[in-house]
């Protein structure tokens, strides 16, 4: 691995003793506001959002190797985390401009890699929407943008975690059969691209290469992939990068995410952990709004704990150390 000693030490702070990244993701901003808005008539307040993040940090970070937060609402939570829990901070603005073509990336204007590091981050995380089949005039802008962030992180000697979310502007529903058919190529080709040294990415945070809801044996309706085909997509994903890579939970249920990790492992994917968000804590949102802080704490200590504990047990059996990657 051609990483500096400082970067290696930082990634070690984000992973457990086995070299597995069992990270809790709570950098949601727009998605969190939408979740909260389902359960209350008024606009979610800054205080509500900050407190919910603090509750999750206080109750669950003792079971996570690290937590991903945003510097907009997550700094009180970063202070509340367990002392042994590493910190990733998000560098991107939430969402994207729906009126502009291409889902172009945008940094938080008040932040830099230097400032995130000064804030105590062990790594910088940036989310990029990427479609390998988009027009080159769009993709060249994205590639240049990621090069800039990569260079910034090299200058500050801080690990760069790149999160890639795939899409297709011609297929509005990425949960559809139509998108499921093109997803494996889009996910794996994007991984291959951003593994190139010019981007200076240290760890990839990625989607699983299939929509598990259309895999034979998991599907309730139409089947897009046989088990063998799905397994091959996971093998291809593992071969697409020499970098450590971790899976995001993409808002699926805790149970489905755990089953997905088992499937990936059996297929031969040597993934190095997870950044799991909503699959762990989403149920606390409604409880917090409707019943208050104490009830939310109780949910986190019971159901939330079970979600993260079950996930950790699955990771122990399925994930491999990032130190085994080149």
From Swiss-Prot:
<dbReference type="GO" id="GO:0009025">
    <property type="term" value="F:tagatose-bisphosphate aldolase activity"/>
</dbReference>
<dbReference type="InterPro" id="IPR005927">
    <property type="entry name" value="Tag_1.6-dipho_adolase"/>
</dbReference>
<keyword id="KW-0456">Lyase</keyword>
<dbReference type="GO" id="GO:2001059">
    <property type="term" value="P:D-tagatose 6-phosphate catabolic process"/>
</dbReference>
<dbReference type="GO" id="GO:0019512">
    <property type="term" value="P:lactose catabolic process via tagatose-6-phosphate"/>
</dbReference>
<dbReference type="InterPro" id="IPR013785">
    <property type="entry name" value="Aldolase_TIM"/>
</dbReference>
<keyword id="KW-0423">Lactose metabolism</keyword>
<dbReference type="GO" id="GO:1902777">
    <property type="term" value="P:6-sulfoquinovose(1-) catabolic process"/>
</dbReference>
<comment type="pathway">
    <text>Carbohydrate metabolism; D-tagatose 6-phosphate degradation; D-glyceraldehyde 3-phosphate and glycerone phosphate from D-tagatose 6-phosphate: step 2/2.</text>
</comment>
<dbReference type="InterPro" id="IPR002915">
    <property type="entry name" value="DeoC/FbaB/LacD_aldolase"/>
</dbReference>
<dbReference type="Pfam" id="PF01791">
    <property type="entry name" value="DeoC"/>
</dbReference>
<comment type="similarity">
    <text>Belongs to the aldolase LacD family.</text>
</comment>
<dbReference type="InterPro" id="IPR050552">
    <property type="entry name" value="LacD_aldolase"/>
</dbReference>
<protein>
    <recommendedName>
        <fullName>Tagatose 1,6-diphosphate aldolase</fullName>
        <ecNumber>4.1.2.40</ecNumber>
    </recommendedName>
</protein>
<dbReference type="GO" id="GO:0009024">
    <property type="term" value="F:tagatose-6-phosphate kinase activity"/>
</dbReference>
<dbReference type="GO" id="GO:0061595">
    <property type="term" value="F:6-deoxy-6-sulfofructose-1-phosphate aldolase activity"/>
</dbReference>
